[in-house]
Amino acid sequence: MHCFNLKTEEKFDPKKHVERVLGRVGEGDVTVACWEPGQVSPYHCHPHATEIYFCFEGGGVMKTPTETVEIVPGSFVVHPPGELHEWNTGPKRTLLFRVRYGGEMSGRTKEWPSNPDWKPRPEDAEYFAAR
């Protein structure tokens, strides 16, 4: 059994969101993701992993190619393998609990407009060019 207290695991950074892996289980992991107001994730996907987010506190907007959904405490979102998504934090600090599973969990980033220092990796450009 793995048992965690999300409030004692949280860690925030004003420059970028913080993800902390709390544990690994089988072909997956459980993490806590801490977001300051206004922070935005890259527009990305996990080609071989399902990703589930549960909003513990705070909130924001989750975008996919087909919809935009407001996320509030108690909400959870399931992204199947390969689904592009972007998280945009609302006006409050946000604490998300995340579960990823399905073998290879690395992500592919398509774009990150809110990060002027971001440059696409060759493997990401190749992945999206093939789609």
Which role fits each region the language model picked out?
Residues 1-31, 42, 109-131:
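A short, N-terminal "cap"/entry segment at the start of jelly-roll beta-barrel domains
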Residues 20-24, 33, 41-47, 64, ...:
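Short histidine-centered beta-strand/loop micro-motifs
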Residues 34-36, 45-62:
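Short, conserved beta-strand element in jelly-roll/cupin
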Residues 37, 48-49, 67, 83, ...:
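A generic "binding-loop/recognition-motif" signal
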Residues 61, 81-108:
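Ligand-binding loop in jelly-roll beta-barrel domains
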Residues 66-81:
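Short acidic-glycine-tyrosine-enriched beta hairpin
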